[in-house]
Design a protein with these regions (language model features):
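Nucleotidyltransferase catalytic core that binds NTPs
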Residues: 1-202
């Protein structure tokens, strides 16, 4: 029996990408023995009310953030499509591209696990991939309720404990807007890029 190779997928707005995203991706890569992790910035993300920075700038920040890690790469597949990005559509396209030799692992945060029932075609998503939900200490209860709900329907979600690093893209944007430093919350090259472009200052 051929052992399938495992590929990690991390989708999101990345507005901006920060150290928390990278730590989750690295924890997942190590825990699930992933060959690589592909970051997939969205063009427009469903259920997001905040207006994001231009897709090309968010894409560039992700490229800068992952370039030093040989296991990490970036795909512009959702940005090239333009329009709304649905995880189920992205997974179908990647399943077709990689074929049966690869197993897809979709990596998400605690909030994404909690909101999964509201996603477009959540059961199809769980059929197409292994869904990994990163959970910080103290944030596991709501995620476990969702996991139990899907398990009753024969769909499994893997919970991945990660260090309690309280960083969010929203907090970073607010700090910049208020003139506070975000150094060490984002990779150094991303920090420099944000400053040079004067992003999130208004």
């Amino acid at each position: 029996m051929t052992v399938k190779k495992r590929i990690g997928l991390m989708g999101g707005t990345f507005n901006p990408i920060h150290m928390g995203h990278l730590i989750i991706a690295e924890e997942a890569r190590e825990r699930f023995a992933l060959e690589k992790v592909i970051f997939i910035p969205s063009y427009i993300t469903p259920n997001k009310e905040v207006k994001a920075a231009p897709a090309e700038e968010r894409m560039r920040m992700v490229e800068l953030a992952v370039e030093s890690n040989p296991y990490f790469s970036v795909s512009d597949m959702e940005i090239r499509q333009k329009g709304m990005s649905y995880t189920v559509s992205t997974l179908r396209a990647l399943k077709e591209r990689y074929g049966d030799d690869w197993e897809l692992y979709f990596i998400s945060g605690t909030d994404a696990v909690a909101s999964l029932p509201l996603w477009y075609q959540p059961e199809q998503i769980l059929t197409l991939c292994r869904f990994i939900g990163a959970v910080r200490p103290g944030g596991i209860q709501k995620a476990e309720e969702v996991v139990a709900s899907f398990k009753k329907r024969g769909k499994n979600i893997e919970l991945l404990p990660v260090p309690a690093i309280d960083i969010s893209s929203t907090d970073i944007r607010n700090r910049i807007r208020n003139g506070k430093s975000v150094r060490y919350m984002v990779p150094e090259k991303v920090y420099t890029y944000i400053k040079e472009k004067r992003m999130y200052s208004e």
